Amino acid sequence: MTLYPQDGQSSPVNFKKKDVEITGCKTLYKGFFTLKSYQLRHKLFDNKGMSNEIVREVLIRDHAVGLLPYDPLLDQVVLIEQLRIGALEANEDNSPWLLEIIAGMIKTGENPEEVARREAREEAGIELKRCRSMLSYLASPGGMNERLSIMVGEVDATTAKGVHGLLEENENIRVHVVSREQVCRWVEEGVIDNAASIIALQWLALHFQALKEEWK
């Protein structure tokens, strides 16, 4: 184990893409998602050379944007509720209808803010005022390539209501307006249990005061 100073520490990760040798790649499935199988070798820690050849499967999908609509005047957030097939497949007792932040895939030529504004209209019937980035992260890098960019958008929460979604995509999405304090309790209680929403709401819990000051 290496101990690092608390201030001014750059990333301790030294290996790069050049330290991976891809010896083979094939597409196993191509539909809404693409599934690929890689054969590869990679550099080992402690100067122990290269690994044996290993096989790794990866799910390929477009990168996406998550949006947390926030009303700084009312101190409320807008969430959506919809059926999620992954939650259904998880075979849990919990409902497969999840409370989530708004989200959508990035189309060719779009930037994250454009996606956030489009999805806010499509999924919640709301218009964003100011919008800013929170962070971005790899959703599940052990088996998927997707990077999710999370944004927070200023809204008038009194305009958020009803059921929305695109008919051609068979979306059926219900809108919820909830106080910031309540959604933070829901995160702690496990009512909200999907990663993008938890990350966005924890960010808001840390930064809401600064955000109110920025957007006043």
Language-model regions: role of each:
Residues 28-74, 82, 88:
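Acidic, metal-coordinating catalytic segment for phosphate/diphosphate chemistry
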Residues 30-32, 59, 93-95, 143-145:
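A generic structural micro-feature
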Residues 2-5, 56-61, 73-118, 167-169, ...:
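Conserved Nudix-box catalytic region and its N-terminal flanking loop in Nudix hydrolases
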Residues 205-216:
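Short helix-capping/linker segments at secondary-structure and domain boundaries
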Residues 197-207:
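Buried hydrophobic packing segments
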Residues 1-24, 29-32:
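Alpha-helical and coiled-coil interaction segments, frequently adjacent to or embedded
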Residues 44, 53-54, 63-66, 102-195, ...:
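Unchanged
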